[in-house]
């Protein structure tokens, strides 16, 4: 997605060898016009697949997931990283390791929001090692629902997340694919669109 790649080049900041900071438009402050375009692109790609729910993980996946769900006219569910007292029955959980935060969290979704009839599109902000998507897949499959595809805003193609997910049989669509960081700049790999 050219618009996204341009924004990454303009406002993204490389930290160390493998972290791209995009807090000015995605992971802290949200550019809603960009998220709306991202949502439209995902919706156009997956409209014919019969998606009934969009699922993400809090927090930075929420904005692109909301706009994708809006464009598809289906509900959006986000997995919570912290358990609260109102989620006390029928909880579906999985362990998820965060590459960026270097911690493992138990993420959860109330089972009443997913059913075996659901066809789910997973949307997330980043794909690095694939652990967030893997955890969401486990939760969705616990409900008996089907994962139709995984939509990623920014993929770190130099990490093994895509390979892990595709080998398990899940289609992955990334709007921006980072090939590498070179001399303080992002070098893109050809995106899926």
UniProtKB/Swiss-Prot annotation:
Binding positions (5-phospho-alpha-D-ribose 1-diphosphate): 128-132
Catalyzed reactions per annotation: XMP + diphosphate = xanthine + 5-phospho-alpha-D-ribose 1-diphosphate
Keyword field: Cytoplasm, Glycosyltransferase, Purine salvage, Transferase
Main subcellular location: cytoplasm
Cytoplasm as UniProt keyword: yes
GO cellular component term of the entry, any: cytoplasm
CDD domains: PRTases_typeI
Pathway: Purine metabolism; XMP biosynthesis via salvage pathway; XMP from xanthine: step 1/1
Binding-site list for xanthine: 20, 27, 156
EC number: 2.4.2.22
Subcellular location: Cytoplasm
Pfam families per UniProt: Pribosyltran
Keyword Glycosyltransferase annotated: yes
EC class of the enzyme, as a word: transferase
Record function comment: Converts the preformed base xanthine, a product of nucleic acid breakdown, to xanthosine 5'-monophosphate (XMP), so it can be reused for RNA or DNA synthesis.
HAMAP family for this protein: XPRTase
Family from the record: Belongs to the purine/pyrimidine phosphoribosyltransferase family. Xpt subfamily.
Quaternary organization: Homodimer.
Protein name per Swiss-Prot or TrEMBL: Xanthine phosphoribosyltransferase
Source organism (scientific name): Streptococcus pneumoniae (strain Hungary19A-6)
Gene: xpt
């Amino acid at each position: 997605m050219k618009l996204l790649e341009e924004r990454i080049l303009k406002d993204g900041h490389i930290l160390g060898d493998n972290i791209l900071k995009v807090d000015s438009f995605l992971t802290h402050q949200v550019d809603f016009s960009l998220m709306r375009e991202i949502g439209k692109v995902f919706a156009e790609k997956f409209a014919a697949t019969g998606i009934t729910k969009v699922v993400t993980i809090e927090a930075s996946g929420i904005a692109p997931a909301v706009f994708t769900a809006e464009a598809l006219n289906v509900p959006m569910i986000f997995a919570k990283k912290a358990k609260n007292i109102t989620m006390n029955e029928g909880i579906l959980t999985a362990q998820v390791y965060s590459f960026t935060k270097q911690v493992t969290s138990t993420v959860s979704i109330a089972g009443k929001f997913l059913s075996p009839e659901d066809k789910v599109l997973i949307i997330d902000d980043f794909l690095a090692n694939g652990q967030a998507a893997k955890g969401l897949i486990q939760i969705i499959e616990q409900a008996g629902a089907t994962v139709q595809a995984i939509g990623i805003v920014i993929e770190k193609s130099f990490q093994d997340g895509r390979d892990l997910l595709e080998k398990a049989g899940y289609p992955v669509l990334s709007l921006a694919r980072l090939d590498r960081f070179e001399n303080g700049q992002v070098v893109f790999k050809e995106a899926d669109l």
